[in-house]
Curated annotation (Swiss-Prot):
GO terms under cellular component: cytosol
Function according to Swiss-Prot or TrEMBL: Essential for the imd/NF-kappa-B (Imd) humoral and epithelial immune response to Gram-negative bacteria. Functions as an adapter protein that transduces immunity signals from the activation of pathogen recognition receptors (PRRs) by bacterial infection to the Imd signaling pathway. Binding of diaminopimelic acid-type (DAP-type) bacterial peptidoglycans (PGN) causes multimerization or clustering of PGRP receptors which activate the Imd cascade probably by recruiting imd, Fadd and Dredd to the receptor complex.
Record site feature (Cleavage), residues: D30, A31
PTM annotation: Phosphorylated. Caspase-mediated cleavage is required for activation and function; upon immune stimulation, peptidoglycans (PGN) induce proteolytic cleavage by caspases such as Dredd leading to its ubiquitination.
Region: Disordered, residue numbers: 1-63, 134-159
Spans annotated as Essential for ubiquitination and the induction of Dpt: 143-177
Domain Death intervals: 176-260
Protein name, entry field: Protein immune deficiency
Keyword Magnesium set for record: no
Record organism: Drosophila melanogaster (Fruit fly)
Length: 273
């Protein structure tokens, strides 16, 4: 409105319109300098910020520690975190704040000089006790090949082929029933294979088991099969030599040793008669 009056002073009339008083504009008033001594311009009620010029703060210390840890792997920034005195907190209050800085450029270099038998990784030991197994096998084989003497001591030459055993292997006589009784008594596991080697069929073995095991035992079955072998064989086939050789080669040597005692007794009787 004041501008319109200045442009058209004759319309509104009056001396005031012709000679208006100078009025400061808003821009001139806002841009005028402010006197600090005036009470309205005092900033005492505002928040006073402490001057930090030239004084390192905790944030600057942490930034510097991060840079130092990235450049130096041996530098520990946690020492700076614990030693930094952050404003507004008590120094004796323990905090759980932690900071871990990891750098992909860090490398661990280990130098070894004059090292012998250097090993990395786990070590696994397996004890198989090979010596114990071998000694146990050796003792088992020794026990099988030796027969105890009357005084209880093992006899090393128990399974040795003696002169009497060689004579039995060369004998062409028909086995006596007393020899058959010794064989049926002392022939153990593997007796079926012995019967097969003597020429007995599976049917004959099964029939003997059915006929005689119900009324006796395996001893009776073996005895009846030996009798059947002698009766069904041709002349000169069922001999003491054939039976002794078969039992010796089949590792039934203990049975042969017991046959020898009976055979020597029979031969002695023949000589005396």
């Amino acid at each position: 409105m004041s501008k319109l009056r200045n442009l058209l002073p004759t319309i509104f009339g009056g001396k005031e319109a012709q000679n208006p008083t100078p009025v400061e504009g808003r821009l001139e008033k806002d841009a005028a300098p402010v006197d600090d001594n005036e009470p309205d311009n005092n900033n005492s009620g505002a928040l006073a910020l402490p001057s930090t010029a030239g004084t390192p703060t905790a944030s600057s210390d942490l930034t510097e520690s991060v840079l130092r840890e990235l450049s130096d792997p041996n530098y520990n920034s946690m020492d700076v975190v614990h030693s930094a005195n952050i404003p507004g907190t008590l120094s004796n209050v323990q905090t759980n704040n932690t900071m871990n800085v990891h750098s992909a450029q860090q490398q661990v270099v280990m130098n070894f000089s004059n090292a012998n038998n250097l090993h990395f990784g786990s070590v696994y030991n397996f004890n198989q006790n090979l010596s114990a197994c071998s000694s146990r096998k050796g003792s088992t084989s020794t026990a099988e090949e030796s027969v105890a003497s009357p005084d209880g001591k093992p006899r090393a030459s128990a399974t040795r082929k003696t002169v009497s055993i060689v004579a039995m292997m060369q004998s062409q006589e028909e086995p006596d029933v007393r020899l058959l009784d010794v064989v049926s008594t002392h022939l153990g596991e593997g007796w079926k294979q012995v019967m097969r080697d003597l020429g007995m069929s599976e049917g004959q073995i099964d029939q003997a088991i059915i006929d005689h095991q119900m009324h006796g035992n395996i001893r009776e079955v073996i005895y009846q099969l030996l009798l059947q072998w002698i009766r069904s064989s041709a002349d000169g086939v069922a001999t003491v030599g054939r039976l002794t050789t078969l039992l010796w080669e089949s590792q039934h040597r203990d049975c042969v040793q017991r046959m020898k005692l009976v055979w020597k007794a029979l031969e002695k009787r023949k000589t005396n008669s």
